[in-house]
Protein backbone atom coordinates (compact mmCIF):
# COMPACT_ATOMS: atom_id res chain seq x y z
CA UNK A 1 0.00 0.00 0.00
CA UNK A 2 1.53 3.31 -0.98
CA UNK A 3 2.05 6.20 1.45
CA UNK A 4 -0.60 8.41 -0.17
CA UNK A 5 -3.32 5.76 0.21
CA UNK A 6 -2.22 5.20 3.81
CA UNK A 7 -2.64 8.91 4.58
CA UNK A 8 -6.07 9.23 2.95
CA UNK A 9 -7.41 6.08 4.65
CA UNK A 10 -6.20 7.38 8.01
CA UNK A 11 -7.80 10.77 7.35
CA UNK A 12 -11.07 9.17 6.24
CA UNK A 13 -11.15 6.94 9.34
CA UNK A 14 -10.57 9.86 11.69
CA UNK A 15 -13.25 11.90 9.89
CA UNK A 16 -15.66 8.94 9.85
CA UNK A 17 -15.75 8.88 6.05
CA UNK A 18 -16.58 5.19 5.83
CA UNK A 19 -19.66 2.99 5.75
CA UNK A 20 -20.41 0.11 8.08
CA UNK A 21 -21.90 -2.71 6.02
CA UNK A 22 -22.82 -6.34 6.66
CA UNK A 23 -19.49 -7.29 5.04
CA UNK A 24 -17.30 -4.90 7.06
CA UNK A 25 -16.08 -1.32 7.02
CA UNK A 26 -16.04 0.15 3.51
CA UNK A 27 -14.11 3.23 2.38
CA UNK A 28 -16.20 4.22 -0.67
CA UNK A 29 -13.77 6.81 -2.06
CA UNK A 30 -11.09 4.16 -2.39
CA UNK A 31 -12.97 0.87 -2.82
CA UNK A 32 -11.27 -0.50 0.31
CA UNK A 33 -13.02 -2.98 2.66
CA UNK A 34 -11.86 -3.97 6.17
CA UNK A 35 -13.61 -6.98 7.69
CA UNK A 36 -13.14 -10.11 9.70
CA UNK A 37 -14.74 -13.01 11.50
CA UNK A 38 -13.95 -15.18 14.45
CA UNK A 39 -14.25 -18.91 14.92
CA UNK A 40 -15.17 -20.67 18.12
CA UNK A 41 -15.93 -24.21 19.21
CA UNK A 42 -17.02 -25.84 22.46
CA UNK A 43 -15.15 -28.91 23.73
CA UNK A 44 -13.57 -29.54 20.33
CA UNK A 45 -16.97 -29.68 18.64
CA UNK A 46 -18.15 -28.17 15.39
CA UNK A 47 -16.61 -24.79 14.56
CA UNK A 48 -18.90 -21.78 14.16
CA UNK A 49 -17.96 -18.54 12.42
CA UNK A 50 -19.29 -15.10 13.33
CA UNK A 51 -18.70 -11.77 11.59
CA UNK A 52 -16.75 -9.22 13.61
CA UNK A 53 -17.88 -5.71 14.38
CA UNK A 54 -14.90 -3.39 14.29
CA UNK A 55 -15.64 -0.36 16.52
CA UNK A 56 -14.29 3.06 15.54
CA UNK A 57 -11.55 2.99 18.22
CA UNK A 58 -10.37 -0.42 16.98
CA UNK A 59 -10.33 0.70 13.35
CA UNK A 60 -8.24 3.75 14.22
CA UNK A 61 -5.87 1.50 16.22
CA UNK A 62 -5.47 -0.93 13.29
CA UNK A 63 -4.78 1.90 10.87
CA UNK A 64 -2.30 3.59 13.24
CA UNK A 65 -0.37 0.35 13.79
CA UNK A 66 -0.57 -1.09 10.26
CA UNK A 67 -0.01 2.02 8.18
CA UNK A 68 0.61 4.81 10.66
CA UNK A 69 3.54 5.29 13.01
CA UNK A 70 2.11 3.78 16.22
CA UNK A 71 4.08 0.88 17.72
CA UNK A 72 2.44 -2.53 17.84
CA UNK A 73 1.22 -3.43 21.35
CA UNK A 74 3.01 -6.19 23.26
CA UNK A 75 0.03 -8.54 22.96
CA UNK A 76 -3.62 -9.05 22.14
CA UNK A 77 -6.07 -10.73 24.50
CA UNK A 78 -9.57 -12.19 24.32
CA UNK A 79 -12.28 -10.93 26.64
CA UNK A 80 -15.48 -12.94 27.00
CA UNK A 81 -18.68 -11.05 27.74
CA UNK A 82 -22.31 -11.85 28.49
CA UNK A 83 -24.14 -8.53 28.34
CA UNK A 84 -27.48 -8.16 26.60
CA UNK A 85 -26.31 -5.07 24.69
CA UNK A 86 -25.27 -5.68 21.09
CA UNK A 87 -21.71 -4.58 20.27
CA UNK A 88 -21.64 -1.05 18.87
CA UNK A 89 -19.30 1.28 17.01
CA UNK A 90 -18.89 3.52 20.08
CA UNK A 91 -17.44 0.78 22.31
CA UNK A 92 -13.95 1.67 23.55
CA UNK A 93 -11.33 0.10 25.78
CA UNK A 94 -12.45 2.48 28.55
CA UNK A 95 -16.13 1.48 28.45
CA UNK A 96 -15.85 -2.14 27.29
CA UNK A 97 -15.98 -4.06 30.60
CA UNK A 98 -19.06 -2.23 31.93
CA UNK A 99 -20.90 -1.88 28.60
CA UNK A 100 -20.31 -5.43 27.39
CA UNK A 101 -20.72 -7.13 30.75
CA UNK A 102 -17.27 -8.71 30.71
CA UNK A 103 -17.20 -12.07 32.48
CA UNK A 104 -14.81 -11.58 35.40
CA UNK A 105 -15.84 -14.26 37.91
CA UNK A 106 -13.39 -17.14 38.39
CA UNK A 107 -16.14 -19.35 39.84
CA UNK A 108 -19.09 -18.43 37.59
CA UNK A 109 -17.18 -17.71 34.40
CA UNK A 110 -13.77 -18.92 33.28
CA UNK A 111 -10.82 -19.90 35.43
CA UNK A 112 -8.01 -17.96 33.75
CA UNK A 113 -6.65 -15.27 36.10
CA UNK A 114 -6.13 -12.98 33.10
CA UNK A 115 -7.61 -12.72 29.62
CA UNK A 116 -6.23 -15.47 27.34
CA UNK A 117 -3.64 -14.27 24.84
CA UNK A 118 -4.42 -14.24 21.12
CA UNK A 119 -1.22 -15.29 19.32
CA UNK A 120 -1.72 -15.09 15.56
CA UNK A 121 0.51 -16.48 12.84
CA UNK A 122 1.66 -14.04 10.20
CA UNK A 123 -0.19 -14.18 6.91
CA UNK A 124 1.89 -15.58 4.07
CA UNK A 125 -0.19 -16.13 0.97
CA UNK A 126 -3.65 -15.66 2.49
CA UNK A 127 -5.65 -12.48 3.10
CA UNK A 128 -6.22 -13.23 6.77
CA UNK A 129 -4.45 -14.19 9.97
CA UNK A 130 -5.42 -16.86 12.47
CA UNK A 131 -4.23 -18.35 15.73
CA UNK A 132 -4.58 -22.04 14.80
CA UNK A 133 -0.90 -22.58 15.69
CA UNK A 134 -1.55 -21.37 19.24
CA UNK A 135 -5.27 -21.65 19.93
CA UNK A 136 -6.59 -19.63 22.87
CA UNK A 137 -8.84 -21.54 25.24
CA UNK A 138 -10.66 -21.05 28.52
CA UNK A 139 -11.96 -23.46 31.14
CA UNK A 140 -15.50 -22.63 32.21
CA UNK A 141 -16.35 -22.95 35.91
CA UNK A 142 -19.97 -22.76 37.02
CA UNK A 143 -22.49 -24.37 39.32
CA UNK A 144 -25.26 -23.80 36.79
CA UNK A 145 -24.68 -22.10 33.43
CA UNK A 146 -22.60 -19.34 31.84
CA UNK A 147 -23.88 -17.55 28.75
CA UNK A 148 -21.22 -16.02 26.50
CA UNK A 149 -22.70 -13.48 24.09
CA UNK A 150 -19.43 -12.37 22.53
CA UNK A 151 -15.66 -12.07 22.55
CA UNK A 152 -13.56 -8.92 22.17
CA UNK A 153 -9.93 -8.56 21.12
CA UNK A 154 -8.15 -6.11 23.45
CA UNK A 155 -4.56 -5.03 24.16
CA UNK A 156 -4.71 -5.40 27.96
CA UNK A 157 -4.68 -8.79 29.67
CA UNK A 158 -6.40 -7.64 32.89
CA UNK A 159 -10.02 -8.74 33.26
CA UNK A 160 -12.64 -6.10 34.04
Regions found by a protein language model. Name each.
Residues 1-150, 155-160:
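Small cysteine-rich, disulfide-bonded extracellular modules of the LU/uPAR three-finger superfamily
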Amino acid sequence: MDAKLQRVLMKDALNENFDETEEGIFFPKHGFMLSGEYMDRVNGGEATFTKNLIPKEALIHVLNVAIGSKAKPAGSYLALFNGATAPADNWTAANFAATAGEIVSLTEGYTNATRPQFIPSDSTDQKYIDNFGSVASVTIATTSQVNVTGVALLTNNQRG
